[in-house]
């Protein structure tokens, strides 16, 4: 089965209480991640497992999976049902709770932008637990995503704050692990390349992904939301012509043999 087949087979099996809307929003990211991994049954460490959909996809694809998360207890029943041990770890403050060279791959998807400190120590930890030849597969929102840039330009022209006041007050009240709910900063591809190299890995694949542009332009939504689909399709065509404006960065770092 292809990465697409595996992801879509999982999507068809999601029960109503299994966050189907989350899957709809993230399915294209899941496909890109799965396609970038070494073949199963490689041993994979997933960093930031909640809500567990990609964890389940990895198991469906026959990978041996371990995970770390800030709140492993919140989905403990799911981890047991999948046969996956998920340990607590705060990457800003702690080393990964594993010995050297344990994993064939590390998945670090949509997490780096939430770290409050420099991500370099965490990336060096990921390099440490990889076996020689192992891969770090990382995705994060693109700082140069054209939709975000246009929104910022509109805010400037209209004299609006970049962050609505109610969002500001919510952010200011976050404390402890809750502070990681927000994005601390976004990255460019050049910055990610530098971070990967400084962590001791070699950059393999480095690609601008359109995971978010594809959401909402599925054929089944055209009759229900024609104007919205047309607008999103236009954005997708624009970023297809200018890949550096796409929504997602995907980079693979490989540990030297």
Model regions and ranges:
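S-adenosyl-L-methionine-dependent methyltransferase catalytic module, highlighting the catalytic core
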Residues: 3-28, 53, 70, 74, ...
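Conserved SAM-binding loop of SAM-dependent methyltransferases across substrates and taxa
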Residues: 51-61
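A short acidic, Gly/Pro-enriched loop at the edge of an enzyme's catalytic core
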Residues: 94-106
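A short SAM/SAH-binding and catalytic strip from SAM-dependent methyltransferases
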Residues: 107-117
């Amino acid at each position: 089965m292809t990465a697409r087949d595996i992801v879509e087979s999982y999507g068809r099996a999601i029960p109503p209480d299994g966050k189907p809307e989350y899957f709809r929003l993230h399915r294209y990211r899941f496909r890109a991640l799965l396609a970038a991994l070494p073949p199963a049954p490689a041993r994979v460490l997933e960093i930031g497992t909640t809500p567990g959909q990609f964890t389940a996809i990895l198991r469906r694809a026959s990978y041996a999976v371990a995970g770390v998360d800030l709140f492993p207890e919140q989905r403990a029943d799911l981890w047991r049902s999948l046969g996956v041990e998920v340990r607590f770890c705060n990457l800003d403050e702690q080393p990964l709770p594993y010995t050297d060279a344990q994993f064939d791959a590390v998945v670090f998807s949509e997490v780096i932008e939430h770290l409050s400190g420099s991500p370099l120590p965490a990336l060096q930890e990921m390099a440490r637990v990889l076996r020689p030849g192992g891969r770090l597969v990382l995705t994060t929102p693109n700082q140069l995503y054209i939709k975000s840039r246009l929104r910022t330009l509109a805010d400037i022209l209209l004299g609006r704050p970049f962050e609505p006041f109610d969002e500001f007050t919510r952010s200011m009240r976050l404390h402890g692990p809750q502070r990681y709910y927000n994005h601390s900063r976004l990255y460019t591809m050049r910055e990610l390349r530098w971070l990967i190299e400084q962590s001791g890995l070699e950059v393999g694949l480095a690609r601008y992904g359109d995971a978010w542009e594809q959401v909402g332009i599925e054929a089944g939504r055209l009759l229900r939301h024609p104007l919205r689909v047309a607008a999103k399709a236009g954005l997708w065509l624009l970023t297809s012509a200018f890949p550096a404006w796409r929504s997602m960065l995907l980079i693979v770092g490989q540990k030297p043999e």
